[in-house]
Design a protein with these regions (language model features):
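Nuclease catalytic cores
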Residues: 12-63, 94-95, 227
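Short alpha-helix boundary/capping segments
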Residues: 42-43, 144-151
Length: 244
């Protein structure tokens, strides 16, 4: 009697979070995204989520006063609130963008065809042809993560250019609410135009190829293992799935 072959599960869709997790450790992605062994939240994550909700509510006109957690960007938030009230085409707050394999727009819950999912904190117009995408950050700015920051901004830019045909250029950025700084800083913005679309598509195809074709998900020991929920020494807390 032939034994039944159990197909090897692979990653069939991705987000920037999944991509960055895979770069750090393929096994970590498998355990979280395929095996669905969820890591418990922590205080920093809970605080970050709460502040994101404060930003969303204020921009959307809920409440009169600016929450103190947002005070370092007070002028920015007041302008965003006013622009949101005008319902300008292209401005979104806490939005979900989804694409198929060939980068056609689709629905987030199109489980059969959606391959790329992107969460947007805020996107607003600088002028009629320029869109600024902002990702609100809490906590520290880490210069050593420059490569990852740029990759994230490139993904935002590609998605925005594909979704909004009237937009000619996109300026994506990270805004650190606890520090009052943006990355890139004012005057040194990353600017993407419609001519960048083919290049960005090729970049992301190359970057995600290994992840989407992986059938082994080998662990990748690194300096972050000691903090990983799945580390061998964390069995008592529900981890321990990794030998390292």
């Amino acid at each position: 009697m032939n034994k039944k072959t159990i197909p090897i599960k692979q990653v069939t869709s991705w987000s920037f979070s999944r991509y960055s997790t895979y770069k750090q450790c393929p096994l970590k992605l498998k355990l979280s995204a395929i095996d669905h062994i969820r890591e418990p939240g922590n205080e920093a994550m809970v605080r970050g989520d709460a502040i994101h909700k404060l930003a969303e509510k204020y921009i959307k006109g809920e409440g009169r006063s600016l929450p103190p957690e947002l005070k370092l960007f007070a002028d920015e938030f007041k302008k965003l609130r006013a622009q949101y009230k005008k319902k300008i085409n292209g401005m979104v707050v806490e939005d979900n963008w989804a694409f198929t394999k060939d980068w056609s727009e689709t629905q987030w819950d199109n489980w059969a065809e959606c391959v790329v999912r992107i969460k947007i904190d805020c996107a607003h117009h600088q002028d009629d042809e320029t869109l600024i995408i902002t990702d609100w950050k809490t906590g520290k700015f880490r210069p050593e993560m420059n490569e990852e920051y740029v990759e994230q901004l490139e993904l935002y830019a590609l998605a925005a250019l594909l979704l909004h045909e009237h937009i000619q250029q996109v300026k994506p950025r990270l805004a650190y609410l606890d520090l009052g700084i943006t990355y890139p800083e004012a005057g040194a913005e990353l600017v993407f135009t419609r001519t960048d679309i083919p290049k960005l598509k090729k970049l992301w195809k190359k970057r995600t190829k290994a992840m989407l074709n992986d059938k082994q998900f080998a662990p990748r020991p690194n300096d972050k293992c000691r903090f990983c929920f799945y580390r061998n020494s964390n069995k008592a807390a529900g981890g321990g799935q990794c030998k390292y």
